[in-house]
């Protein structure tokens, strides 16, 4: 019995040692792993090459796959040199990789190693990381020096670059551009999307110069069309248009919509004469517009839109864009000057006018709940040909764009700004622009459809010449127009949802 008792303290001591050892193992082993430095994969492109060791050949083999730049890895502090190149062994998601030591950085701001980017798709340069303010415009082929960036996307691409360059006017500019329009080399920037460029490059209105521009100067790269989970787009719209006065009878129009299968409403935010309501955000931009709205109460207008939303109706806010008598009165410097016409018309080249309309669009979408903004009169005046032919017109063309370029560039700007808010963007166009030429007023159906979420053409009977019998026998004419529009849709990689306007007013 006494011998047994002598072993008890020994056993207790052994057990205590084992417990202490186990505790130390649990406590200190993870700390050792955590003590290893965490680094980030860096590159001048979205992917970082990695290597694995071929034991038979006693060398590193490059994988055909890439790791995404910006990925966090654990530096295992095991370096290996081969052919004068230093490699580090890193761990990521439980796997070990050989990575070039030069591809590891400590600071997330050092993840991007490119110092310059080139413009593939002409792009708006923004004053700030966020916001609508326009600093300048970068043209296809321009080289931009990188100053910084905002955020890394999941695929390693950059959302926005902060850049510095000298623009086409000679202005020294520091601003922000969307990374999706940039490429790493000048060769890639100057390249065109050949499959679609070849279709459009010879498009011309017979031998006559319309001064609308050449399709060769337009962008034909695919544009990713968003889908917002909290705001699904209306794919098959049966819509009704309500001008500003109709808001007063909104209950009657909702009842009419329910009775006739209408699932969407296009509601005026601004027509060519006035705002629907006093929008605070544009008060300083156009005092005349702010002080002379159709309805004095913003709340009254908002409540009418809300009734439509509550009824399950998809609400599209309409903005007359480049035909605006009130903005023109406040900003004559943004308007076209010409001896051909006495009508005051803001120029589609004017970034001041772009900005004003997008401030209004984003504010109305946020305040009233519009799910989509539809821009009408996204063009130059009908007299644009005569203005250009006269030779004395000042179109305020600061960046030396062709008319069709300006229209497409506005669409890029507007779509980007609205998409940031989860709002869709659509444009109204003349039926004529579905023809295989760029119109004198700058509209070319495929160039617009490529960019926007929905496109609404207006093949109205009264838009045709008097030689065509559009009122008593419209079907052949409308069929021919629809055939052309369908062809234009097939000539681009990312066509918009087509929603054609139908005339519902009395025949003459």
Question: What are these model-derived regions, one by one?
Answer:
Residues 228-245, 303-306, 316-363:
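Active-site-adjacent "subsite" loops/lids of carbohydrate-active enzymes
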Residues 260-296, 382-389:
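Aromatic-lined carbohydrate-binding/catalytic grooves of carbohydrate-active enzymes
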Residues 250-275, 365-372, 454:
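Catalytic domains of carbohydrate-active enzymes, especially glycoside hydrolases
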Residues 54-69, 127-143, 148:
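SH3/SH3-like (including bacterial SH3b) beta-barrel domains
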